[in-house]
């Protein structure tokens, strides 16, 4: 099919559906409610999150009078620094575990200008749950929505300033790893990654939104107390159930993790795009 005839919203929906089906029907919000995933992520943010926060804050203009909407706020990676710079922040976070960590972080820091809305963005009622309009709307690595076009339309409906979407560009290190492990453990099994920034850009383009883009790399360290903890963690991630599968996974992991003092580290590398536009120049 010719590119100009492609329905990029449908492409996103199909790729996200395939990805979720591959994960047993688990969407992004449900993933963070498994075990200690949310708290583990916050530990990684504390170790490595400053790099991304600096990348973002160096690029955007935020004033003390601004009202900010943070979609998929997670543990407060951006909501916390935003609270020190803006008049008000609305943090939308669907995961029970992530929302719990977020509220704990806000309470520990005595932050009172952040409202938490614990819902999927798709389920948020713009009039009942929010207080629009917002000067700044941000969705940072939180675009796990199936219908991304509708999700963006909702963002634009509550914004009269800039909208920033941070998302992955190309294969992440965990995409590469998942393909290798799947082939090792299960043979010729198709791996379906989430749709990436190329699809997102084209969705926006077909909506009549011609965004600005900048590309930036990031890395994060996932630390474990022991090598056995790594094997147990990724054994669950990759559904390594038999002794043979566990042995193969153990050998694979021994080649890709690093010893770091008394702990072991899995390094994640990923290239990203920040896609943004001034919504005051768009028709919603």
Task: Annotate each PLM feature.
Residues 2-62, 65-74, 164-187:
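Conserved class I S-adenosyl-L-methionine
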Residues 77-78, 82-123:
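Class I SAM-dependent methyltransferase SAM/SAH-binding core
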Residues 134-150:
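A short SAM/SAH-binding and catalytic strip from SAM-dependent methyltransferases
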Residues 149-164:
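A short glycine-rich, Lys/Arg-flanked "PGG" loop and its adjoining helix->strand segment in the class I
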Residues 192-208:
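Short alpha-helix
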Residues 210-284:
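Conserved Class I S-adenosyl-L-methionine
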């Amino acid at each position: 099919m010719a590119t100009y005839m492609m329905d990029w919203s449908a492409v996103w929906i199909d790729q996200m559906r395939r990805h979720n089906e591959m994960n047993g029907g688990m969407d992004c919000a449900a993933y963070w409610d498994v075990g200690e995933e949310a708290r583990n992520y916050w530990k990684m943010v504390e170790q490595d999150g400053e790099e991304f926060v600096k990348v973002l804050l160096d690029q955007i203009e935020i004033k003390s009078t601004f009202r900010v909407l943070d979609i998929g706020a997670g543990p407060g990676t951006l909501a916390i620094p935003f609270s020190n710079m803006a008049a008000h922040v609305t943090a939308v976070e669907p995961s029970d575990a992530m929302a719990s960590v977020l509220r704990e972080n806000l309470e520990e820091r005595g932050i009172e200008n952040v409202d938490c809305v614990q819902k999927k963005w798709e389920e948020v009622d713009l009039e009942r749950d929010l207080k629009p309009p917002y000067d700044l709307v941000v969705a940072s690595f939180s675009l796990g929505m199936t219908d991304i076009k509708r999700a963006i339309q909702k963002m634009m409906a509550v914004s009269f300033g800039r909208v920033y979407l941070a998302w992955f560009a190309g294969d992440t290190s965990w995409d590469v790893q998942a393909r290798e492990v799947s082939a090792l453990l299960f043979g010729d099994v198709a791996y379906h990654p989430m749709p990436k920034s190329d699809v997102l850009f084209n969705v926006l383009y077909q909506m009549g939104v011609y965004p600005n883009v900048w590309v930036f790399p990031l890395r994060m360290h996932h630390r474990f107390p022991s090598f056995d903890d790594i094997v147990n963690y990724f054994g669950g991630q990759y559904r390594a159930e038999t002794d043979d599968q566990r042995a193969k996974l153990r050998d694979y992991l021994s080649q890709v993790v690093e010893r770091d003092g008394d702990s072991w580290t899995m390094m994640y590398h990923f290239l990203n795009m920040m896609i943004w536009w001034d919504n005051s120049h768009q028709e919603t």
